[in-house]
């Protein structure tokens, strides 16, 4: 592998992490030497370390302003008495408590795990200091990058509301809902501090539009039907409104079929969807010597979808069709 200072530093960091995550809290890299071989085609790397001994955790406590019930906060303490000290578990605990405070609106909370080391007993007493800061509220929710989709299509997916406490869970849930629409290649959420305040943020969602439609054509052949041609066009974000519109056409020697479908995913503000489809089919059975009559059929369906959870819907669909038989050539 080709030598680079950046790779060496990365390797040294990985080495430190390996030891710190396995109880060696006093691990230290004493020195590093890099020497070039006489033929100048390779290098020797010598790393001198002090491994130290393993340290056990004795106590794990919380301190500071505990705004969430302490019994609940303790569930996020990943280290327990008697376990080997692990820096990654300290970091994960800090992140989990910070995220939990973010759910309650404490966007700028800080959590620091402070180890008290007893070198004689080879133990560590951990104390997590919690500073929730002020509860934060959302001033505005803004959208960027939606060059095709109108703002309302994005805004109705929001679970985080303006003027409400900023919940990291609701902000993330809103981001996921935008992704599920299928209109965007990427969705990012960013909390932006409002100048002159320490308890207000703006939430900015940046999206990258992608194609939300499809067009297709088909050609086939069957002995009785002859050449079969088909075409369809489906747009799931029609004119940027979030509504679904589709048309289809199939034609052969003895049958023609035309169809149209439409879905409004927000027929009501609560997210109840309504859709309908219609079709017309003309079949000339005389063309394939089956019968001396033609059937014209008109039909359609109407459907409703009711959201019962974030990812599930209850659907209802009804349909009907009316065939008309007439003599061939009539």
Task: List where the protein language model places each region.
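Interaction-mediating elements
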Residues: 1-181, 185-203, 207-212, 226-228
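Gram-negative/organellar outer-membrane beta-barrel architecture
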Residues: 6, 164-330
């Amino acid at each position: 592998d080709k030598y680079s200072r950046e790779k060496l530093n990365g390797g040294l960091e990985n080495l430190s992490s390996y030891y710190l995550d396995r109880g060696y809290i006093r691990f230290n890299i004493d020195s590093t030497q890099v020497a070039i071989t006489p033929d100048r085609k390779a290098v020797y790397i010598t790393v001198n370390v002090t491994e130290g001994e393993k340290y056990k955790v004795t106590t794990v406590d919380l301190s500071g302003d505990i705004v969430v019930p302490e019994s609940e906060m303790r569930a996020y303490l990943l280290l327990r008495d008697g376990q080997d000290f692990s820096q990654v578990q300290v970091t994960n605990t800090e992140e989990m408590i910070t995220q939990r405070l973010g759910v309650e609106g404490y966007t700028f909370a800080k959590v620091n795990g402070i180890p008290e080391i007893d070198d004689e007993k080879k133990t560590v007493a951990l104390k997590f200091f919690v500073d929730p800061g002020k509860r934060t509220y959302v001033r505005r929710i803004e959208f960027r990058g939606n060059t095709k989709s109108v703002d309302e299509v994005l805004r109705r997916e929001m679970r985080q509301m303006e003027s409400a406490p900023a919940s990291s869970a609701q902000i993330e849930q809103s981001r996921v809902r935008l992704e599920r629409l299928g209109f965007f290649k990427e969705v990012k959420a960013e909390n932006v501090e409002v100048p002159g305040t320490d308890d207000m943020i703006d939430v900015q969602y940046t999206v990258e539009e992608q194609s939300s439609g499809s067009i297709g054509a088909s050609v086939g052949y069957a002995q009785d039907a002859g050449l079969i041609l088909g075409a369809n066009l489906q747009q799931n974000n029609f004119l940027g409104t979030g509504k679904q519109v589709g048309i289809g056409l199939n034609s052969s020697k003895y049958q023609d079929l035309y169809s149209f479908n439409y879905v409004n995913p927000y027929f009501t503000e609560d997210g109840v969807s309504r859709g309908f489809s219609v079709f017309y089919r003309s079949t000339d059975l005389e063309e394939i010597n089956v019968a001396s009559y033609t059937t014209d059929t008109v039909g359609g369906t109407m459907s409703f979808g009711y959201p019962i959870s974030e990812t599930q819907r209850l659907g209802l669909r009804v349909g009907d069709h009316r065939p008309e038989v007439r003599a061939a050539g009539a």
